[in-house]
Amino acid sequence: MSLGFVLGDATKNHRQVLLEQITNWQAEDPQAKIYYIVPNHNKFSAEVKVLDYLKSQQDNQDLFATSNVQTFSFTRLAWYFMKDTATYQVNRITNAGLNMIVYRSLQEHSDELTIFKGEQTQPGFIAQLVSQLIELQQSCITYDDIERMKENLSQQDTADSAELEAKLHDIAIIYRDFMQMTDSKYLKPADILPSLTQYLQNEDLSNSYFIIEGFSQFTAQEQAIISVLLQRAKEVRIDLILNRGVTDIEDLSDKQSLFYRSERTYYLLYQQARKAQVKILNDVYPQELRVETPELQSLAKYWKESTDLKPINVEKIGDNHNLQVIKADTRMTEIKEIATRIKQMVALKDYRYADFLLLTPDLNKYRNIIEPIFNDYKVPIFVDLAKKMIDHPLVELLTALFNVKARHYRYVDMMRLLKTELLIPKTEYGYLGIKQFRQDLDLTENLILKFGFEGSQWLRKDDWVYYRFGSSDFGTQTDVQEKITKQVNVIRRYIKEILPPFFKQLDEAENGKEAAQILMNFLIINGVPEQLINWRNKALEQGDMVMADRPEQVWNLFCALMDEYVDTLGDLSFKEEDFLNLLQTGFEGATYRQVPSTLDQVIISETTATQMNDRKVTFIFGATDLVMPNRIQNTMLLTDMDRELVQGTLDDEKYLSDTAEGRMAAEPFMNYLAFMTPKERLYFSYPVAGVNEDGLRMSPYVNRIMKQFDLPLYEANGEPTLEDKKVLKFVATKRTALSNLIGVARQAKGQKQPLPVMWRYIYQKLQEDATYRRLTRKLMAGIEYSNIPERLKTEYAEKLYGKTLNTSVSKFEEFFKNHYAFFLKYGLKLKERDVFELSPANTGEFYHMALDKLLKTLKQDKVSITDINKSQFDAYLQQVLGGMEQLPQFQILQSSNRMQFILKQLGATVSQMGWALHNQGQRTKMRPLETEVLFGHVGTENGLKALTYDLGNGHKVNVRGKIDRIDQMIIDNQRYLGIVDYKSSSHKFNYQDAYYGLALQMLTYLNAMLQNTDLLLDLNAGEEIKPAGAVYMHLQNPVIKQKDILKNPYSEVLLKQNKYDGLVLDDQELLSNLDTSIEKAGNSIVYPVRKYADGHFGGIKNSGNVITFDNLMLLLKRNEELIQEAAKLIFAGDVALNPVLWPDRRSALQYSPYKAIMQFDELLGNQYYRLPKENTADILQKLAQENSAESEV
């Protein structure tokens, strides 16, 4: 029985001393059984190193094996000794099973609990409580210890002690149950080491030798095992990163010193050995340096001195090429730089992939980019980041299944369920093929989004019907749509067949056991295990062993969770929400098994994980100020203050894990261990930005090192530039070389420069490569690509649009905004999929229809809206609105309580606007003549004629539309007609937009009205019609400000909010009668006109609202020219990608749904159609000049 320590800082070759000790023991004692104990994290690597060393001591044997030297972790040591004992045959229980035990205990002791009462419903509380109970057990703390703690605390009269006493009261109740319900029935992870401690007390270890390496501290359970080993084993050697032995408590350094943690461990072990009267051997200090380079040796010395706040006595090294700092613009650039350096060092220097170790404080930040990038660079890696099972489709299926039941077939839950691809309908030939299933599901989702099918719609008797509304096939169903209907209903019927019976059975389940059986039967009957087996087999066919193993791991865990649920909660009533939470927590804490696929690969891990320090090169990446040092928080139920109070009541062999403060104090030491992992080179790297991360800064640790050693900062370029002279770092693999070649070639073309010599050489070599020749030529040819659409041939344009273009004026507006977008929408008829929602178009249609019906009903009754009172108006409005929500296009307004509320708001807006017409009528002589006037619509009665233009070459254009309202005024036998256009948002007439074809609607409607006056009115012979103008009416239920009401009557404030805006003819007779209420000089609150002090009427200053007859005619003429110009360009196949860019930087691309298709990029030759900055006067001057020029011709 003896204890020996191997001590030294991290630069020394500790392992060599330990391995030599093995051979010494073997020489001294041929019967020696040697156990090499390392952290579980390092077991595989350590075992390889031990075997390699032992083999090297043999005489040229190709094969080597040994049974007397074993490498274990503490838990694996327990398996080795106890695998055949009764203890080890007891059923294992997962953490999820422990959650279930604690859940039951919380329910059963609800009346006894104080601060934990009702907490089981809080997300994460049960898992947090289980973690705390496990920590108590790992700390060797018993129920009786907790009771003693409570007694001690009750004698302290402080708020902290009182709160902790209450907390321990509840913990004690649950902890007692926790231990009793698992004792002898289950083997918990926290039971393994105590069982080993007990077992070893009766085991003959007189020929056993133990080496313990890789630890800086031990849990109380591990310490208990060591205590037994000290008393029963022949010899125990413990290796610590420590520069001196500490035998007296007074000799312990300050908690902030670098080696404090190791000092404390040494002291505890030393005292433990003395107490047990175990012989303590002289400390052994390795003399051989493991760290080979001066830079790293100096770094170790500096880090010790600076952390211990000692004078810095470190000589600066020359070029420091073995110690470097790299700055990258993004995390992706950072990983690419590392992959490139590794690839080149392996290719050009004497390195293997196994010589590299990559560490980062937070590997989660890189989890989505590491594997793809290293795969691109063909660098084999093992990412030591356990992947959680919570994201597996089986877990998604279970979650969605219970959500579908709880929330009654909601769209989100149904798609989540079906998209797991674990529930597949069966046909007479077997399961539906996955390709067919995906197509059917896509069509089903489209239909659901279009018509809002959810809830009971899934269970209805009648099939869903797929159809599309169109101008030519309204209400009909084509053969294609009939086929889609059948595909969609395959899935709907399948859901209707399997889910309602399952849900009914769950509702009838008497207890948890029955519910678990029902769930398991449902999954098996519907082929979920079969689908998982199919996934495994496909992965095996593709040679992906990692993915092949996962379906079985997940299913096995699910079965284990179900067994544990039945055992622990099966006799209780079944609560679906609690059951699902327990399952999800189980999967959340579960991870997939990971085994390195090859020995020669780069290991990627976190700086906090203990590493074998046998690598030549280490990259510490992601070294930012946010994570190095780490910002540690205590997430356990016992706070740091609680821990300090508790620890004072415990014996030396019982102790909790470190406080957050203690772990923060150990950060320099943990990072020191990471710094010292390599033998030769250490690289630090950090990004300045990441996904949703800006302003990242270098770690203060790295900053200290950089300043101490005057290290230069290497900036990693994500992409090469023409100016880069050193191109080697951009050609790590042929694929990356090609990718970077394309980037440089594109730059060369853009700058009109020749391709640099080195890149021409790379281009030549890639062309000579049989694998990359074709791809290289194809991609290089793409450099000449410009994203310029080709003009369509006239014959193709005619096939798309016909020889006669029957269209609305709004489509021409879209054409002038972007010719290519028009082609995509109306030529190729591309559209976004329909979604069941209340769009602005829907609300606009509701307003238009309601106002149209209101005015038509009044006209039918020969009543003027001006002459009725409020009660009569309300009666008419009720008649008009009644039943509108039953129309197919407005059925969404009945789909939910929210939509019914919106329906009331829509009705209120219609009421406001209708009454505004009444109030306006009190002040103006303008009266509604017709509403919803159609022109150019084939097959409609009483419609007006289309605006028709012959374009030549057999082409013609017919413009159709619908005028919201035509108003009329008759003054002294002079008739004026005007247009009113309803808008859901505020609109003003923009002369520039009208000139460039971006606002054609109002002028086109005015033209259509003027050309159809004979169909609108019974005119007397020679009677002339004057255009009153064209105005917008903003349909709104305005919010009135209090200050406005205080200054003016409420009715006037409302009128101002509903004031017309647009163009009005400069005619004094007309203007003076548009608002007869203006007595003094001032603005009208009905129309955009003003009465001036001299009595004449005109427009509001600089508004352009009032227009002369001649200028109006010029606008109408320009409008007709634009329509013909657009139609000619369309027939000529013009599909230019020329989105308009207004002077205020708005563009036609801003809200376009076709941006992904257009791929607009000014670097690829695309250009905006930039409008000049012009005002109303500029446009009118242009029109006059153009008209004058035409007159002269």
From Swiss-Prot:
Enzyme Commission code: 3.1.-.-
Cofactors named for this entry: Mg(2+)
Presence of keyword Nuclease: yes
GO biological process: double-strand break repair via homologous recombination
Leading EC class: hydrolase
Entry keywords, A to Z: ATP-binding, DNA damage, DNA repair, DNA-binding, Exonuclease, Helicase, Hydrolase, Nuclease, Nucleotide-binding
GO molecular function, one term: 5'-3' exonuclease activity
SUPFAM superfamilies documented for this protein: P-loop containing nucleoside triphosphate hydrolases
One Pfam family linked to the record: PDDEXK_1
Chain's role: The heterodimer acts as both an ATP-dependent DNA helicase and an ATP-dependent, dual-direction single-stranded exonuclease. Recognizes the chi site generating a DNA molecule suitable for the initiation of homologous recombination. This subunit has 5' -> 3' nuclease activity but not helicase activity.
Note: Despite having helicase-like domains, this subunit does not have helicase activity.
Family recorded in the similarity comment: Belongs to the helicase family. AddB/RexB type 2 subfamily.
Self-association state and partner proteins as the record states: Heterodimer of AddA and RexB.
Protein's UniProt name: ATP-dependent helicase/deoxyribonuclease subunit B
Gene giving rise to this polypeptide: rexB
